[in-house]
Swiss-Prot record:
Alphabetized GO MF terms: DNA binding; structural constituent of chromatin
Subunit structure: Heterodimer of an alpha and a beta chain.
Gene name of the encoded protein: ihfA
Keywords: DNA recombination, DNA-binding, Transcription, Transcription regulation, Translation regulation
Claim: DNA-binding is one of the keywords in the record: yes
Function (record text): This protein is one of the two subunits of integration host factor, a specific DNA-binding protein that functions in genetic recombination as well as in transcriptional and translational control.
Cysteine disulfide links: none
Entry GO terms, CC: cytosol
Organism: Mesorhizobium japonicum (strain LMG 29417 / CECT 9101 / MAFF 303099) (Mesorhizobium loti (strain MAFF 303099))
Name under which the protein is recorded: Integration host factor subunit alpha
Length: 107
């Protein structure tokens, strides 16, 4: 399953090629979009990108955990966590891609 990792620079290059902005403007656009998404998540807002995914922040209460080495009980403090839920559209695209690669003799 491993493969290439998509980076900010890759996104900026894709915007440059597809939209026609300069490389600098493309990089600034990618940064602005990612910054807005990050700020919304930090504020506790749900970010829903249709046909892609939903990012949601939720609170977790304090609970008792266990140190796997010693077996000792330890408190896990309350915290906020982000969840990522892919859309059905994205899930189906991944499934189709996997099925197509298997049909072509891939893994």
């Amino acid at each position: 399953m491993g493969g290439k990792t998509l980076t900010r620079a890759d996104l900026a290059e894709a915007v440059y090629r597809k939209v026609g902005l300069s490389r600098t403007e493309s990089a600034e656009l990618v940064e602005a979009v990612l910054d807005e998404i990050c700020e919304a998540i930090v504020r506790g807002e749900t970010v829903k990108l249709s046909s892609f995914a939903t990012f949601h922040v939720r609170s977790k209460n304090e609970r008792i955990g266990r140190n796997p080495k010693t077996g000792e009980e330890v408190p896990i403090l309350p915290r906020r966590v982000m969840t990522f839920k892919s859309s059905n559209v994205l899930k189906n695209r991944i499934l189709r891609s996997h099925q197509n690669s298997k049909a072509k003799g891939g893994k």
